[in-house]
């Protein structure tokens, strides 16, 4: 799985406003770290990296056309990008309760003759919530329903930005706020998580 993540950051000593500032800063920093070489900056040192020959340790891949996100919950900020599958790789399993939410979301969208988001279940939002639920419930057994997820994630806020420039469907510049896809919008609402817009 190609993705980029950073270590959790304890912000419990900060005011709520400072915590949200850290949420935004961590997201933008992750987008910059995870971005492939900037095509508009010939001096970007990432141009020297041979992506085909470089082995990236897990969670440090360079990406473009992706999403970086951070989750603020109980005084901790965690950051993660969306994920893409490499040859011979599998996507990580989402926490069972969150996987169930995404299955419900897909059924709901298809029942209305729609299509799930392009990154359904692979977006930064899905990985962030799953990672947090796994920290709270490592065995995947005590948080098992939508109500359990809502209780566990009470007060959580999420912020997401574009990695690299996006041309379609809506033009977005690198580092610009990126709203959740149609699948994640519904999933975050079901989980009781607020999408912070900055």
Where are these regions (language model features)?
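Zinc-dependent deaminase catalytic domain
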Residues: 1-198
